[in-house]
């Protein structure tokens, strides 16, 4: 009872803090001068990280097993992963771009986890025999950390595509005469003062998005690879085969292939930027199919802890 109450308190405290942090981010996005307010939001994410950590530890102690046995626990761990990805660059380089992605991602996942949809599995149950293995921590934690990093990196690529598309659309309007000559003449005058600085800022932003997208996706790909390999070893111990082409395994392999292609395109300078970002955007959709969409089916060797099983 005590652990359940503590878990309930930590869940709502962390969710409330993340909600406040998102609001602060929106305010600082509109008013750049409020530096102290932004610093408060960063401290809020750190507090959220420790609250979610306390929540996971509490659930671990109360259940007797690592809290990664169902969809609710994996969503909480995913939210924890987003917070972890947020605070590490903050302490090292104070990366502002990444925080715009990790904050909303954390509140989205934790908000869904604490919603009424998953109420029936909020209480920890007995671990099913298939999950009673020392590989649980290694395999599932690496997979969730991989998903979190890949999602963040993919969202950075989506932002890169949006900015690039807006820039190209403006150039398209100019080249096809959709803007009248007098307007272009006035614009050319302004280019001597503000256009160069604006384009420099946009170019720097695109480069940063591309750089951090690559860095975060590389990290996520490493986690995903470790997760798949450890899962194969676990599968051999549990089911007698390293690979069974289960729906979850198949989509995890597809996810790995997509991001392997992304990393391969990065070796070609001409394919960096928007071209590789398109592949990462496709990967973003594939991750959600692998992580959440397959659970909707409720079939296969990974059907335990699925979304549909919560209502059976």
Curated annotation (Swiss-Prot):
It is a multi-pass membrane protein. Keywords: Chloroplast, Cytochrome c-type biogenesis, Membrane, Plastid, Thylakoid, Transmembrane, Transmembrane helix. GO terms for molecular function: heme binding. The chain crosses the membrane at residues 9-29, 44-64, 71-91, 111-131, 143-163, 216-236, 251-271, 277-297. One of its GO terms (biological process) is cytochrome complex assembly. GO terms for cellular component: chloroplast thylakoid membrane; plasma membrane. Its main location: plastid. It is found in: Plastid, Chloroplast thylakoid membrane. Belongs to the CcmF/CycK/Ccl1/NrfE/CcsA family. May interact with Ccs1. Required during biogenesis of c-type cytochromes (cytochrome c6 and cytochrome f) at the step of heme attachment. This is Cytochrome c biogenesis protein CcsA. It comes from Atropa belladonna.
